[in-house]
Regions:
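Glycine-rich phosphate-binding loops that contact phosphosugars or nucleotide phosphates
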Residues: 1-114, 118-127
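Generic alpha-helical secondary structure signal
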Residues: 36, 61, 129-136, 172
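Internal, active-site/partner-interface "lid" segment
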Residues: 127-160
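Acidic, Ser/Thr-rich low-complexity intrinsically disordered segments
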Residues: 154-170, 190
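Ala/Thr-enriched low-complexity intrinsically disordered regions
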Residues: 166, 176-179
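Short linear proline/tyrosine/threonine-rich motifs used for host-factor recruitment
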Residues: 183-185
Length: 192
């Protein structure tokens, strides 16, 4: 599953890829600063693949060319765009429409983010066992590596709360423990 969203659509593509990675093993978020770089990342796309292209006015020509390339390679093309008349739909077999008529110099991502969120939730419901297994595994990893739990700053007293206290080592204890090993622990070790 390839996902492409360029310029103001990049955060949408990133959000979609983040959650798709929890559900699927084969997600590739396309990063690009040039058209050729985009095609290099897609060189192996084929009939068993899908690409999701996200683009809104003013439509990205690089996204459109990526969808054309995928279509020419017989990949399934899905678009998330603002209208059935969007040029992004030229190569698409499935169009997810997120109309946003907001007249502003700032692109509103509310409507497309809602469509993406609904897509993620629908797929999670379809793949409940796989997603539950992945989330259980991630919870264990997050707990082990203290990703979320009790590692916030307490803004009242500016102290860091950690579930596991920092371990301080005495330099002599480390030297004694590793005297016969060829392990370099360097000056970055927390020692007193």
């Amino acid at each position: 599953i390839y996902i492409v969203g360029i310029r103001s659509c990049a955060p949408l593509a990133s959000f979609l890829a983040f959650y798709f990675n929890l559900m699927f093993d084969n997600v590739r978020l396309l990063h690009t600063s040039s058209s050729s770089e985009l095609f290099e990342q897609m060189v192996r796309i084929g009939k068993d693949d899908a690409i999701i292209g996200i683009s809104f006015p003013r439509y990205s020509m690089r996204t459109l060319k990526a969808l054309e390339f995928a279509n020419n390679r017989n990949a399934k093309v899905i678009t998330i765009t603002d209208s059935v008349h969007s040029p992004m739909n030229l190569y698409s077999s499935c169009n997810l429409i997120a109309d946003s008529d907001m007249a502003s110099i700032v692109d509103s991502l509310v409507a497309p983010l809602s469509v993406i969120n609904a897509l993620i939730v629908a797929l999670c419901m379809k793949k409940q066992k796989e997603v539950a297994g992945t989330l259980t595994m991630l919870e264990d990893i997050w707990d082990e590596y203290q990703v979320y739990e009790n590692d916030e700053i307490n803004y009242i007293d500016d102290s860091i709360k950690m579930r596991y206290p920092a371990i301080r080592y005495n330099r002599k204890d480390i030297d004694a423990k590793y005297a016969n090993n060829k392990i370099y622990y360097g000056e970055d070790a927390i020692c007193s």
